[in-house]
Regions:
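A glycine-rich helix N-cap at a beta->alpha junction
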Residues: 37-69
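Flexible, glycine/charged-enriched surface loops at secondary-structure junctions
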Residues: 13-19, 53-65, 126-140
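Short glycine-aspartate micro-motif
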Residues: 19, 66-70, 160-162
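Short secondary-structure boundary/capping segments
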Residues: 34-38, 83-86
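Conserved active-site and cofactor/substrate-binding residues in soluble primary-metabolism enzymes
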Residues: 1-2, 14, 35-43, 61, ...
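Alpha-helical metal-binding/catalytic segments enriched in His/Glu/Asp
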Residues: 1-30, 36, 42
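Active-site-adjacent substrate-binding region
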Residues: 74-81, 85-167
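Generic secondary-structure signature for well-ordered alpha-helical cores
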Residues: 8-12, 45, 49-53, 123-132, ...
Length: 168
């Protein structure tokens, strides 16, 4: 919901923006409405065709030159279960949106790792806009962790990072 509202309230027209809503993350992002489907890729191809561009490489380059925030929640410091978090790397309430450079579970399984150049772009944009943000991770290896769809977007060489609010 917050991603859609942010898009609708946006006043920039310099770049094409979209909000892709998917489900089925808990079962592997499969199915026609999951992030592993080709819905997003096909939609980009259809938009290019509508604009008169039928070159296959254009779709690849459009996806590759895109930036994405994979909106999801992040684990906040839970005072009842402090042992599952790294106290220096855990998100806290009221410190702003959380950027997760690295997500995944069981070490590197199903992980995504945002590139530092994209993180720098985001930090500069948020600093310039005086918007509070923080970095965090989901928890200690094999104690915390969780799924992400960021890797499904990163497969297009897209710059992507998990971003969202901290919750218990």
């Amino acid at each position: 919901y917050t991603s859609l509202i942010a898009l609708l309230d946006s006043d920039t027209e310099d770049y094409t923006a979209c909000c892709v809503l998917v489900d089925k993350e808990e079962i592997g992002s499969v199915g026609a409405t999951g992030a592993a489907s080709v819905f997003f890729e096909n939609t980009v191809a259809e938009l290019l065709v509508k604009s008169g561009d039928t070159n296959y490489l254009s779709r690849i380059k459009a996806l590759e030159n895109s930036y994405a925030l994979s909106s999801d929640v992040n684990a906040a410091l839970d005072p009842l279960f402090k042992e599952v978090a790294s106290k220096n790397n855990v998100a806290r309430f009221n410190y702003g949106i959380v950027f997760e450079k690295y997500t995944g579970a069981r070490g590197k399984s199903g992980a995504s790792d945002a590139n530092p150049e994209y993180i720098a772009i985001l930090r500069n944009a948020f600093d310039d806009g005086n918007i509070h943000f923080q970095t965090g991770e989901l928890g200690k290896v094999d104690l915390g962790g969780g799924g992400t769809i960021a890797y499904l977007l990163a497969k297009y060489n897209m710059s992507v990072i998990d971003a969202g609010v901290p919750v218990l």
